[in-house]
Amino acid sequence: MNRILRTGIITLGLALFLSAFSASNAMAQASPVMRDILGRMDRYNKALTSFQSNVTMVKWDSLLNANDTYEGTASYLPKSSKNPMAVRIDWSKPAVEQMAVRGDQYELYRPRLNQVIKGKTNSAKSNGAAGGALAFMSMSKAQLQANYTVRYIGQEAISGGTQTWHLELTPKTPTSYKTAEIWVDSDGLPRQAKVTEKNNDTTTVLLQNVRTNVTLNASIFKLDYPKNAKIVNG
């Protein structure tokens, strides 16, 4: 799977985590602090109709001890009775690329190559690091509870100074990654996420300038590219 597509899917996993997680998942065994955090997340999710944000993504290669940094914007519409879930990511650095996911279909447009990669998200699940992030996408609340152990790590300030609660999600069954971590703000929004793969490579996603419940035209989730673009099945 294309490297940018993998990184885009990590962001997608974070966004879809918002619609998959519920306070009820862990209330039975939660501490008072966890109950508060999960309750805030649950209320945020129920009130969320859309969001847009700036995205910074850092991929760290543990073998080379080197980072690759990506910057762009994300738009998100949760699943409704009338429409499937929709996510769009527009990368501006280091290269201009656009990714859109609507329901179980994704498209990745690479202008510099005049190429469009198309496929289904479920077929992407088996592709390396993408699998772990995409797991968030299709999990029901019951599946999330069954597959992850949630641990409260503590309070931390993330880049920009935002105060957050730091949670660690450890898969109960083998996956392509070891752990996922999220940093939840006072509104109940995961502002940062980190996935650590089995080889200790990490991908960290930071959301900034978040605008919630904005008016989004569904047409933005359909990529606009030249008719002569080369189509590649992902």
Region spans (language model):
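Hydrophobic lipid-interacting interfaces of membrane-associated proteins
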Residues: 58-60, 94, 200, 212
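Gly/Pro-enriched, hydrophobic low-complexity segments
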Residues: 117-119, 149-234
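An acidic-aromatic
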Residues: 74-132, 203-204
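Positively charged n-region of N-terminal signal peptides that target proteins for export
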Residues: 1-6
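N-terminal leader/targeting segments and the immediate start of mature chains
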Residues: 24-70, 77-82, 225-234
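Bacterial N-terminal signal peptides
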Residues: 11-20
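Beta-turn initiation residues at beta-strand->coil junctions
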Residues: 57, 109-112, 194-198
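Flexible, surface-exposed loop/linker segments and immediately adjacent secondary-structure boundaries
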Residues: 114, 120-162
